[in-house]
Amino acid sequence: MPNYKLLYFNMRGRAEIIRYIFAYLDIKYEDHRIEQADWPKIKPTLPFGKIPVLEVEGLTLHQSLAIARYLTKNTDLAGKTELEQCQVDAVVDTLDDFMSLFPWAEENQDLKERTFNDLLTRQAPHLLKDLDTYLGDKEWFIGNYVTWADFYWDICSTTLLVLKPDLLGIYPRLVSLRNKVQAIPAISAWILKRPQTKL
């Protein structure tokens, strides 16, 4: 088993999907969390100057979803068939497209607040309606078993609920999916032991 070192800020953010996958697959890794004050000196040393990165076998891998795909490849978390793998990727990319619209680093607070409000009140309902329709009466997004698309939904929706606690009020099936992910023993154990951060 390779030695893994995950580098990210002390927050869930874009690294949490990697941590969920490590937890579920029971893979040991170093969860290295850096302070914001140290970021300016660390940034120039990394590929493309972004985190998270995963150090493995002398390589520094970047892009959280690429890392997630690397870790889930050849496991059922990625989907059992090529068609299911495409469906998993499509749900993940749909969620990521939306989450990437948020101007997390915007310094103009008025603009940031207006944009967040627009995304949460006007655009999120369209996404949630589509996700609810896609899920339907199934237990999981794809197939009859958990995939990392379900993990990513739980992670993204946790952040969205911090920003707008009533967001899922009319989507009990999406809430139920969150609950099912969080009830998986390995995920539940991780949630209990992880550092408590807002985002």
From Swiss-Prot:
Residue ranges constituting the GST C-terminal domain according to the UniProt record: 81-199
Cofactor: glutathione
Keyword Cytoplasm: yes
Superkingdom to which the source organism belongs: Eukaryota
Family matches, as CDD domains: GST_C_Sigma, GST_N_Sigma_like
Matching SUPFAM superfamilies: GST C-terminal domain-like, Thioredoxin-like
Keywords, alphabetical: Cytoplasm, Fatty acid biosynthesis, Fatty acid metabolism, Isomerase, Lipid biosynthesis, Lipid metabolism, Prostaglandin biosynthesis, Prostaglandin metabolism, Transferase
Main function: Bifunctional enzyme which catalyzes both the conversion of PGH2 to PGD2, a prostaglandin involved in smooth muscle contraction/relaxation and a potent inhibitor of platelet aggregation, and the conjugation of glutathione with a wide range of aryl halides and organic isothiocyanates. Also exhibits low glutathione-peroxidase activity towards cumene hydroperoxide.
PANTHER family: GLUTATHIONE S-TRANSFERASE (PTHR11571), HEMATOPOIETIC PROSTAGLANDIN D SYNTHASE (PTHR11571:SF224)
Record's protein name: Hematopoietic prostaglandin D synthase
Gene source species: Rattus norvegicus
